[in-house]
Amino acid sequence: MIKIADIKESLAGKTIAIDDVVTTYSNRESSHKAAWTYMLASQLTSIGLNAKVLTKQDNVHDFDVWMVALPMEFEGSYNLFGGANDEPAARIKRLLDYSGDVYCLNREMPNVGGFVESRLKSCSDNWKALDINRLGNICETIKTVDTSTDSTTFILGDSHSVSVFMPGANISRNDGKTLFGVMKEGMETYIPKGTEHLITYFGNIDIRHHLCRQSNPLESVKALVADYFKHLKALNINRIEVVKLLPIEFEGRRIPKTGWHKDAPFAGTQVERTQLMEVFNSEVDRLAEEYGFGVISWPSDWYDTHPELFAKKYMEKPGSVHLSREFYKYNFITNKENLSLKKTINSLF
């Protein structure tokens, strides 16, 4: 693995494409899956590089350098919703034809040739025509680039953490991680040495799946936040900011099975979880003042918005537990604070 700082000079003045070899990225701001890739582009542009996330309309051959961004949910293999047909075959062929430098962002480049071979039993003719051995050889030569910098600002959180990413900062996104779980492991195991400004964003998952299962949910949430602040204080970091939790969306919202726990999309009613969220956020405000920490809040009108409208307006489409990129704290294209957060919608009608 090489650090982005080690190759920054060689990339200066070059156009950089950020794209996967097999799958595509959407330019829709409501796409949470694409948001991580746009954040990677933000990391590169914030250090002066000319990087762009490609969509279906772009041609990677128009760019000097290709930075491969694997899908956010990638776990060693690709999901081909339409099968091994001509469309993904054409995308993979781009790697065979590409003449510029290729890197893989933050993760080891998978063997695309091996993946192609695994789908030969049911595929199109163009898929069969792909040079498996050459693909494998190319992938072996692709180096991994670590996009982290020497920034002293560090963001630690679950899958929601990308929504508070600050251009120029480093980030550790831990999908499915609860506040209870990260404290049990110890946040210090995640935080790099030299961190002077820590932003933490945990708790949405605890509210969604776990706290309503406790014998006394209200006391449990208060105890959880109290432990949270004691844990943060023990880290002895100069500046700490805690992100408040999002409003609780309506119960009819479709949640992908990846967001379920114990065969359920949530535990507790919308009203019960809203009460816990409000207590959590209230305790964050109270303890932040006591401990001298900062608080990162969401627009107050969101909490007065009808739960169904909140989901339809502010969350990822068509359904998930995440905020739409349109309402992240920063705009990843401009690297400036997001003015969309000033918009207000309060009524379902």
Where are these regions (language model features)?
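Short amphipathic alpha-helices and their capping/turn segments at secondary-structure boundaries
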Residues: 3-11, 57-61, 92-94, 144-151, ...
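Surface-exposed cleft-lining segments at the edges of enzyme active sites
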Residues: 23-30, 74-82, 172-181, 205-226, ...
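Oxyanion-hole/transition-state-stabilizing segment in secreted/luminal serine hydrolases
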Residues: 67-80, 188-222, 246-255
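Histidine-centered active-site loop/cap adjacent to the catalytic His
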Residues: 128-141, 275-277, 285-286, 292, ...
